[in-house]
Amino acid sequence: MAWVLASTSPRRKELLAQAGFSHLDFSFQLVAPNIDETPLSTETAEQYVCRLALEKAQAGLALSSHVVKPQVLGSDTIVVLNGLILGKPIDQNDAKRMLALLSGQTHEVMTAVALTDGEHTFNRLCRTQVSFCELSAADIDAYVGSGEPMDKAGAYGIQALGGCFVKSITGSYSAVVGLPLVETRELLACMMQHT
């Protein structure tokens, strides 16, 4: 059996390495799934993020035909503020808009994880509350100018410069970064029990 991470996120790669089982020869390969991330008009934020994680895992499985008995992990993270889904910004103005919305507010970060081998599929959803301090226009401009927000849900990275804006967090820090470690370990353990 071989573990495959269906992601191009360097943060997920780093986090998955942390989730390794010390008593096993745990390593993983990377594949880059390409899925349509457009929300469906009828789905909730929870349904949306769970669907994306599952579709990434399934697309990763399709890309893993060269791997013997692949176990493919897909994950997705969104930021939700008052029912509004904030994905990755499309440009700098979009990043500034998102950060202005998050300023002084508490939002929810949802990270879904799905693991499949084609026969068995397991998934988890992790919800974390994050409160931001008030951000000035200068704060937002400087942060967006750093380039950091451009590939991150909600236009911030808690593990880097964006962490300076976080007043408090209730829930999983690693889920906000992009991969909830406790839930991921649970999925890996479930899969190992079923194979």
Curated annotation (Swiss-Prot):
Q: How would you classify this enzyme at the top EC level?
A: hydrolase
Q: Which InterPro entries match?
A: ITPase-like_fam, Maf-like
**Gene3D superfamilies from the xrefs?**
3.90.950.10
Q: Which residues form the active site?
A: 76
| Site annotation Important for substrate specificity: residues | 11, 77, 159
Which biological process terms from the Gene Ontology are attached to this UniProt entry? nucleotide metabolic process
Q: Which UniProt keywords apply?
A: Cytoplasm, Hydrolase, Nucleotide metabolism
- What family is this? Belongs to the Maf family. YhdE subfamily.
Name listed for the protein in its UniProt record: dTTP/UTP pyrophosphatase
Q: Which source organism? A: Shewanella frigidimarina (strain NCIMB 400)
Recall the taxonomic lineage recorded for the source organism: Bacteria, Pseudomonadati, Pseudomonadota, Gammaproteobacteria, Alteromonadales
